[in-house]
Every structure is written in C-alpha cells, then in structure tokens.
C-alpha cells in the first residue's frame, strides 16, 4: 500500500511591490474592518477619534453665528467674522491635507490589489480563497474611500462657500465700522461745536450781566424818573380828559338844541305856509296821521264849495315835502288808510277841480304802531301764522262769505275755510299785498291780495292791528325768499 503525502511548500516567494517613501498616512496602523451583510466591509468606529468632523464644526459655527448676529455690535461682529474666517482657512488647509491623504490611500490600495492579484495566481486551495476574500475587502475599501472622497469634496465646497461668505461679511462689517466711525466723528464734531457756541453764549451773557451791574445805579435812577413821570401823568391826565369830555358833551347838547329848534322852526314855517295855502285851498286833510288810522279829504269852504265827487284825486307818498313824490296806484278816493310801507313818510293828495289843482299834505310823517314790531317778532317764531278774515271782494266783485283763515307761512300764503282752499301760492313777483286803496267799508282793516294774475281778493281782518301785522309779516317772509311784496306799481 502506498501512502501519498502532498508536497507543501514551506515558503511562498512573492514579489512585493515597493511603496513610495513620500506616502503619509492619517494613522500609524491599518484600520480595523469587518464583513457586514452581503459581504460589505464596514469600518469599525474609532474609539480614539479626536473632536467632531469638519461638517459638524461648520454647522455648529454657522448656528452660533446666526444666533449671535443680532446681539453683537458692529465691531464685535467684524472681530467674530475675522476669527471665523481664520477658522475657515484652517479647515480648508486641513481638507487639502485630507485630500492628499485620500490620494495616497488610492495609490496604496491599487498597489495592494495588484499584489493580491499576483498572489491569487500563485496560490490555490484555501489560500486562494483567503486571497480572493482579501481582494474583495480591498475593493470594498476602494469604494468606501471613493465615498469618503465625495463627502470630502462636498465638505470642501461648503467650507469654500462659507469662507467666501465670511470674507464678504467681514469686508461689509469693516465698511460698517468705518461708516459708523465717520458718523460718530461727525456727531462728536457737531456736539463740540454746540458746546463751543454754548460757552460763547454763556460768556456773552456773563459780560452783559457784568455791564448791567456796572450800570445799575444809572438804570435805577432812570426807572425812578419814569415812575415819577407816570405818576404825574396819572394825576393830571384824567382831569384833562374829563374836561374835554365835558366840553364835547356841552357841544353835543347845544347842537341838539339848535337842531330841535331848526326842526321846530321848519314845522312852524310849514304850518304857516299850509295855513296861508289853506285860506285859498277849499280842501283840508283830517284824521290821525298814524298807522291804523284813516285820512279823509274834506271840503273847507262853505260858499261856492266844489263837489268832491266831481273832483279827480291822486294820493302820493314822499320822504319829505321837498323830495320826489311816488304815486300810490289805485289810491284815487277821498279816503286813504296808511299801511306799514307808509310809516316815516309824508302823504299828499292832489285834487283837480274845475281845472284847478290843489294839494293837501300831512303835517308830519306817518307815525308807526308802537306794538307792531313786538307782535311781528312773536309771530315769526311760529312756522305759520293764521288770521281770521272775511272776503269782501273777489276779482273786483262784491263777495258775501263767512269767516276764512288767512295763513301766512315762511314760503307761501294760503286762504282757506276748513278743508276748502280758495288760494295757495308761493311768494313770487306776480304776488301783490298792500292796504286797500279803493272805496270800501273799514279801509283800515282791509288788504288787497293778488296771489297770481287774474285772481284778486279784498280781505277784511278783525282789527287794524291784525291787518298791519299780517302785511308786515308777509313782507318779511317774502324778503327772505328774495321777493319784494308790495302793492300795484309800488
């Protein structure tokens, strides 16, 4: 029986690829790896790893920078940016060193893989499997190294970006520092100028106060003299003023007396003149010359007296005897009842008889009714004022009627009886209202009213006072509506 023993080589002669002496490693020993699922090589964590990674450091610094940005002053911010810029430069240098180490790792892994490939071709059996396993681990290390290089490139890009940002921010901070410095210098100069001006003003004030203290006695003397002069003026001035006031009062009294004497003389002359004329005038004017009364023309001569009914009569009103007269349209009868428009005026009547003209005149202007203004004021407090009237004529024809209500409003006049309205018109230029001027009973209580063209009324009031109040009130309301409410041709 033959026993076969396999030949086992005691030593394998391998050609080792030389490694460059310039290669630098991150550590002094080979890292520890283990196989994970699907034959993936997983690097075991290093227990002696010192400090965080570059990415964590950059993130931490960025967070601190963003948190403290609002709280730092401009100068502190610039100093912080300078420190961070230096840290970013050091991190960039460290990344460059790691990039060089990564490149050397690739070279070393390439050489190691080539050596393992060479050994795989020279071995068989279990050793060959171990070599193939080692080759797989080397390839996995190469992939891991490539991934680390990608992360390193990304970190390098972020570090470079952060460095540029910090550099630009540092320059901006320096500009802000310089700008604030210039502003501060300008404010300091302004404050210094203000302080100088205040100092000059205080010095000027002090000089003025010293000068005033030096001139104190003279000023006190002047003040005493002024006070004495004022006292003398107060003692003598009122007496002089009172004397002048007494003189003016005496002059006014004398002028008033002379005026009254002149008016009295004019009246006496007018009376004498009218008496002389009345001796030759067969007519005379009688009646109270005031509002609410009635003036009548009477025949004065007894022998050869003309018949008044055969005479032509026309009444006039004038401001005075010598002024221009205004004919009263429709006043052609022997009697005439003055209305509020005649107050303060002289009334005259021309009488034409047998070709001769005679004139009768009131002695004085027509006197007003003392209670009329207060009555009108009380009525104006109401929105409408109502008066009881009787229609004597309508459109020139006699009209027998019962009592009606004559309503004078702020914008219109209405004549009604109960629910029946005879006339209702707004104030207009076609409306007329005045005392009656024709031959009618009780002319002192009657008015002529034309609401519109082709419609006229003769209305009789309960009293002379009511008649005059209605006329005055209606004219005031019409004047407020920019309408002049008078009689025909007034």
UniProtKB/Swiss-Prot annotation:
Expression sites by tissue: Expressed in roots, stems, leaves, siliques and flowers.
One of the record's GO cellular component terms: cytoskeleton
InterPro entries registered for this protein in UniProt: SCAB, SCAB-ABD, SCAB-Ig, SCAB-PH, SCAB_CC
Chief site of localization: cytoplasm
GO biological process: actin filament organization; circadian rhythm; regulation of stomatal movement
Keyword Translocase tagged: no
Localization in the cell: Cytoplasm, Cytoskeleton
MF-aspect GO terms: actin binding
Source organism superkingdom: Eukaryota
Keywords in alphabetical order: Actin-binding, Cytoplasm, Cytoskeleton
Record family assignment: Belongs to the SCAB family.
Cited function: Probable plant-specific actin binding protein that bundles and stabilizes microfilaments (MFs).
Protein name in the entry: Stomatal closure-related actin-binding protein 3
Protein species of origin: Arabidopsis thaliana (Mouse-ear cress)
């Amino acid at each position: 029986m033959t026993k076969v023993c396999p030949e086992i080589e005691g030593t394998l002669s391998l050609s080792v690829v030389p490694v460059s002496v310039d290669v630098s490693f991150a550590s002094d020993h080979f890292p520890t790896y283990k196989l994970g699922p699907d034959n993936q090589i997983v690097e075991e964590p290093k227990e002696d790893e010192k400090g965080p990674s570059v990415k964590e450091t950059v993130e931490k610094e960025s967070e601190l920078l963003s948190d403290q940005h609002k709280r730092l002053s401009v100068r502190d911010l610039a100093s912080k940016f300078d420190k961070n810029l230096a840290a970013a430069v050091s991190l960039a240098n460290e990344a460059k060193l790691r990039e060089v180490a990564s490149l050397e790792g690739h070279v070393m892994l390439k050489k190691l893989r080539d050596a393992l490939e060479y050994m795989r071709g020279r071995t068989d059996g279990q050793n060959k499997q171990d070599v193939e396993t080692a080759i797989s681990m080397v390839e996995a290390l190469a992939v891991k190294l490539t991934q680390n290089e990608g992360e390193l490139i990304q970190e390098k890009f972020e570090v470079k970006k952060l460095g540029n940002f910090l550099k630009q921010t540092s320059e901006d901070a320096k500009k802000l520092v310089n700008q604030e410095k210039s502003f501060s210098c300008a404010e300091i100069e302004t404050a210094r100028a203000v302080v100088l001006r205040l100092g000059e003003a205080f010095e000027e004030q002090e000089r003025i106060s010293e000068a005033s203290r030096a001139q104190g006695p003279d000023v006190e003397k002047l003040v005493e003299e002024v006070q004495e002069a004022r006292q003398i003026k107060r003692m003598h001035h009122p007496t002089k003023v009172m004397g002048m006031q007494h003189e003016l009062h005496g002059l006014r009294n004398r002028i008033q007396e002379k005026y009254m004497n002149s008016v009295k003389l004019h009246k006496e002359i007018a009376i004498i003149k009218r008496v002389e004329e009345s001796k030759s005038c067969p007519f005379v004017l009688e009646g109270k010359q005031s509002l609410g009364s009635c003036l009548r023309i009477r025949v004065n001569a007894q022998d050869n007296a003309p018949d008044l009914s055969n005479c032509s009569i026309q009444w006039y009103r004038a401001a005075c005897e010598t002024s221009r007269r205004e004919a009263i349209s429709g006043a052609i009868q022997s009697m005439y009842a003055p209305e509020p428009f005649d107050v303060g005026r002289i009334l005259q009547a021309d009488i034409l008889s047998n070709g001769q003209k005679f004139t009768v005149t009131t002695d004085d202007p027509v006197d007003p009714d003392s209670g009329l203004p207060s009555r009108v004021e009380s009525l104006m407090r109401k929105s409408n004022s109502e008066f009881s009237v009787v229609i004597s004529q309508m459109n020139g024809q006699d009209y027998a009627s019962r009592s009606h209500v004559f309503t004078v409003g702020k914008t219109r006049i209405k004549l009604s009886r109960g629910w029946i309205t005879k006339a209702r018109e707004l104030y207009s230029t076609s409306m007329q209202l005045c005392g009656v001027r024709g031959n009618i009973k009780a002319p002192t209580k009657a008015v002529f009213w034309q609401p519109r063209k082709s419609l006229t009324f003769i209305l009789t009031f309960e009293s002379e006072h009511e008649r005059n109040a209605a006329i005055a009130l209606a004219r005031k309301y019409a004047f407020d509506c920019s309408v002049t409410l008078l009689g025909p041709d007034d």
